[in-house]
Amino acid sequence: MVIKAQSPAGFAEEYIIESIWNGRFPPGSILPAERELSELIGVTRTTLREVLQRLARDGWLTIQHGKPTKVNNFWETSGLNILETLARLDHDRVPELIDNLLAVRTNIAAIFIRTAFKHNPGNSLEVLAEKEHVEDNSESFSMLDYDIFRGLAFASGNPIYGLIINGLKGLYTRIGRYYFSNPEARKLALNFYQQLVILCRDQSYDNVMECVRNYGKESGVIWHSMQSTMPSDLSEVYR
């Protein structure tokens, strides 16, 4: 187990999470007593207590007063905030994780972009106008892409869509920094944003879903062509 954390709390958090992931503390099991665990990890009980509370908030653990701390099945109890952690823990499954993330983005974006254009076209066009100021580099495009999807999600009038995109931000933007290092990816994205502008201005709401899904397929082709040269630890790219 290689742990890169600098602080005692960070070390303890990574130790426990990696132990859950690797089966040392499997889902459904009970964590060792606080004193034993603090000695095992090499941190104070106060530090350990703070870490356990944070992990419980993130869905890794269940803490009940007077009862032992239980390890959860994190797939069922955690939220989007653990995506970056999962990418760091299992490099071999990163491509699958990213494919699933992009599929979710495409499926929900097809819905919220149509709604945004229909109910809030002015705000939608303002969001899309950000493309006029983007610099031709991966960092700038990564943030632009995130900001456009996030902005249109909130423009839909349903803030839940925006919160979902917020939850994807960390891993999403790191993926973007690698993906948008490809000039073809940047060109495809600009073309997609322009298509959205036209659909919004023409009130062609029924064509939005097809446009978004086509972009998902075309960007997926580029993404898959880049996987063979993808860094082994994408979650750390340009951190």
Curated annotation (Swiss-Prot):
Pfam families per UniProt: FadR_C (PF07840), GntR (PF00392)
GO annotation, biological process: fatty acid metabolic process; regulation of fatty acid metabolic process
Keyword Transcription: yes
PROSITE patterns referenced in this protein's UniProt entry, alphabetically: HTH_GNTR
Assigned keywords, A-Z: Activator, Cytoplasm, DNA-binding, Fatty acid metabolism, Lipid metabolism, Repressor, Transcription, Transcription regulation
Residue ranges annotated for the HTH gntR-type domain, each copy included: 6-74
A GO cellular component annotation in the UniProt record: cytoplasm
InterPro entries the record matches: FA-response_TF_FadR, FadR_C, TF_FadR/GntR_C, Tscrpt_reg_HTH_GntR, WH-like_DNA-bd_sf, WH_DNA-bd_sf
Localization per Swiss-Prot or TrEMBL: Cytoplasm
Major location category of this protein: cytoplasm
The UniProt record lists the keyword Repressor: yes
DNA-binding region: 34-53
GO molecular function: DNA binding; DNA-binding transcription factor activity; fatty-acyl-CoA binding
Cited function: Multifunctional regulator of fatty acid metabolism.
Subunit and partners: Homodimer.
NCBIfam families, alphabetized: fadR_gamma, PRK04984.1
The name this protein goes by in its record: Fatty acid metabolism regulator protein
Taxonomic source organism: Photorhabdus laumondii subsp. laumondii (strain DSM 15139 / CIP 105565 / TT01) (Photorhabdus luminescens subsp. laumondii)
Gene name for this UniProt entry: fadR
